[in-house]
């Protein structure tokens, strides 16, 4: 199947649930992740051949998106603070607002600790879910002790 045909099919499927413009953006975001294409690929290579297996999976996933399943759950990953984290329906999808919380926390740590070593720093992330906050704090504050806690059934 040609990429342009897959895009048309995806937009038609998802437009049943979302405005067409938003559906088109969702299709492009999906294809960029699933096929490794980039925005310009959709424009300059409309005859790009998508293998049958990828086309079939994409069509199924477009149906899931039309049923309001978040793209992050379909792809099994979400971006947060410049990193990619695994997600599934048992954890909340990391939000941009939470990135702001991390940025503010890191700024406060920098102003409070100054040049002191992060080894004096202890961070606890309760109800960690995907672990994106704990991992971000650990990676941005080398030497800090980070504890992430959650429960699961």
Where are these regions (language model features)?
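SAM-dependent Rossmann-like transferase core, predominantly class I methyltransferases
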Residues: 46, 50, 56, 60-142, ...
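N-terminal auxiliary segments of SAM/dcSAM-dependent transferases
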Residues: 1-75
């Amino acid at each position: 199947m040609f990429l342009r045909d897959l895009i048309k099919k995806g937009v038609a499927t998802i437009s049943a649930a979302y405005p067409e413009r938003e559906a088109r953006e969702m299709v492009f975001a999906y294809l960029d992740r699933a096929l490794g294409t980039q925005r310009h690929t959709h424009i300059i290579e409309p005859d790009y051949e998508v293998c049958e297996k990828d086309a079939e999976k994409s069509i199924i996933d477009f149906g899931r998106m039309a049923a309001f399943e978040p793209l992050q759950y379909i792809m099994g990953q979400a971006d947060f603070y410049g990193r990619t984290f695994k997600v599934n329906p048992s954890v909340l999808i990391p939000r941009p607002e939470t990135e702001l919380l991390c940025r503010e926390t890191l700024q406060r740590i920098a102003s409070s600790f100054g040049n002191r070593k992060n080894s004096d720093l202890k961070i606890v992330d309760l109800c960690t879910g995907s672990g994106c906050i704990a991992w971000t704090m650990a990676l941005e504050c080398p030497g800090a002790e980070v504890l992430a806690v959650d429960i699961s059934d």
